[in-house]
């Protein structure tokens, strides 16, 4: 974009502005948003100061940020995102927005140069006093001394929470001399201390808990946007007590008890750990002198204000909203007199003392003394929308007027296409710039602004894809993610005390933890399991692979089995029979398909390439891979039968559309079968829009079509006039005949009835079939189906999908009103989820009184199908603002303009349901909001509380996400394998089921499980060899290490585990050293055919297998073991060698030496 800034920089108008910008109060008029951004960016580039850009709200801030990223390095661009809504202070904060705020405050506190975009609400918000914030900026360097207690104390002040193992953002742990911290910004880090000196700093992977790279120094940012010290708590207690005593007599008696509960709920008086998320609502009482963000800026900062009058309007409504919000919470006993979140001074007062540059599109009167007014003449660019003739005449006009023409396109390939298009129009153009650009020609560069603009006085026009092709999307340069990807789904196999487990031989029990028991004078660790009644089972940790976590649907509580009973055997036999049946069915289908002859497509045509280049978005890697897999299938002679899985909005439709286009290009017809009329309509519109420039005849068959239209479509399918038909089950009626059907696309097959599924089966005969589903298919199942069912998976979301901001809060009409107003004010729509059909119309009336001007519709499952469809369609077409609905919206409806979801009684829903419902919003380029409400002052059941806690962690990462994924995976398995399998999965747990299925499939395919070459080794030594709780306190970590030890087969693995133990837990004690010795002995034994090493008190018995006895070179062994002298005796029993070792001092070392010698004495067999 340097060409643009160069042209601007040389212009006299800009130079006039540059002289007074930041020097005196100036009004700049006439500039469109993108032109204004270009000027501000150039001013920033030329100065060494901080620049503050104030907008009226966050939406505006986001828009300007996207354009500014084209000119300013992301490292120097900061935003202070505060929602335009009070409710935010009362709900769980989204870590994304919080980390952005912290990044901004930290940069300001450190005096960094940057361009800072702050919405009005952010400017007025009460913040931690600047000095306190500065005192809590920490940089740690290797070699420095730290006071550990003081350091840990500071972390707590900064909002970090102490845990035994760090797995989430905002946590820290202390183990021995190792401190782990997971900051809000950047990688998790591990600090190793030598007494009080920092010996090393490393970043580590949360997934594996292993260190990665050494670093010399690290900045630790706060984990909350408020600092809470002991002093702050002391001050807060006094202020809150006064506020409580002041409020109590002034409110209605009926709510005084509620006020008392609110007051006590902050637990200020008995707790030592304070939840920053909750205390933030008391910010007005926290600090003696709180700051606002303006106090964080340098004194010479440059200030630019975007649309002053709009800011004043927002300020007015903000003040009114804030007042009514505070008085509402006071009247309902949820707040105190004196509570506030923003400074009430006028906007102008806040920025007093700074020379300000005001940008306004139109000349306007302002109550401010202005020193300069600079007027620009700026015009919008005509929208061409791909109309070639208009485009040519406009470009010709620019050339004739000697304009500098800058054309911005979003990808490199489009640069070449654009140049070819201009040369067809005889417009001179260049794509590479050498020094200066002459006027009267176009320069085509990669870049993107929200809109084009024309500055006639400068002789400059900037044209973007939006004007050229009505491009829907504007690419944003990727911002560095504030939250690292280290928190991807951690295995949901983590065992917690109380979890249900499945023991392969004993069935379903409950995990009670790891216990160290003394058996025969030696200490060992055992996994303690609870079975039916009082039965308990202790499983030695070296047999832990027989125990799996029981994973089934969220609402299923399994029945505990009885130890020693026969019910588990019967259950397993039933499931075994069922998986064998399924395996057989799958294999038969697969063989039948392999034998079938279908149509073999050729390579992609030129039209296909053009069609694919027309797609306005960048494909995700998963989409591209899926498309390649589908095309490969189509180019084979056997018919395709592929299942494409991908979350809602991840771009499955585009993949299907490309397959459909390929089929049509070879003269084949395509049937696109969907479960609902609405989806049919949406897919139909997508196809029409994508294929408008190509000679493809597309028709729709659904209830929205007249009998006459349907008759014509049927006729067209028969004669071959219709290329693609989209429809509901109407497509399955027997009187439909295709001239040459080549591809059948089925969306969400599991939602069709049995009769329809049978009909789909007959249609599939010798035709390529692509089935789409939004329910994820589990990885393990995916693996066991390899070779019997073709699966493509889209797991990556499209770029620039904003994470949905999720709030969990108590039900309160003022919160609801505020959320509704906010969405409607940005011309959006709202899903209001209310799951009680009997009172849904009363709820609508209640909302209508709250929002008299809104159009509100109702949708629920007891309406007739036609009414429901018409309501949904009207909502999609923007005829209603709010849809009060039951969970009927859970599947398949796409309303890009609905970006707020409010769910009443969220505690009654399953997590996977909430996860899918939340996927309804945030599907366009706007931020989506989801409010999960739970009844105020209701005592929640433990499961509901856990569920809400999990939802709080929903922000794409935490355990809530894992549970939802787990539940959906099981649902996906049920869909793929048939409904009754769902029940079987629930009886034995998902993992055991997958394992049994995989074995059955392999057996039916004739794939033998590779027989283990190496026999099991039993090592039984009377030694204290275990992981003491003093060394590893966290049970999950303990189990994880035991699992690794159990799987160890090489010395490299042993060295790796030793490194890991020292890395994560510091130097290990003697019990752990012995445990590692035993594993080392086992590894030697594995490699040398030893089957048993048994401690018999004074001697140790070693048994070799017959095969190992044949392979051993006795001469080499005797020579090597001479140092052991008479302590070693050799014998033979049943053709197998036995060795006894008499115990002496250091006998463990002698044993290690002996097994090593046995391994080295093995003859290498020639068979290889």
Curated annotation (Swiss-Prot):
InterPro entries: CarD-like/TRCF_RID (IPR003711), CarD-like/TRCF_RID_sf (IPR036101), DEAD/DEAH_box_helicase_dom (IPR011545), Helicase_ATP-bd (IPR014001), Helicase_C-like (IPR001650), Mfd (IPR004576), MFD_D3 (IPR048635), P-loop_NTPase (IPR027417). Residues 633-794 form the Helicase ATP-binding domain. GO terms for cellular component: cytoplasm. It comes from the Bacteria. GO terms for molecular function: ATP binding; damaged DNA binding; DNA helicase activity; hydrolase activity. It is found in: Cytoplasm. ATP binds at residues 646-653. SUPFAM superfamilies: CarD-like, P-loop containing nucleoside triphosphate hydrolases, TRCF domain-like. In the N-terminal section; belongs to the UvrB family. This is Transcription-repair-coupling factor. The lineage of its organism: Bacteria, Bacillati, Bacillota, Bacilli, Bacillales.
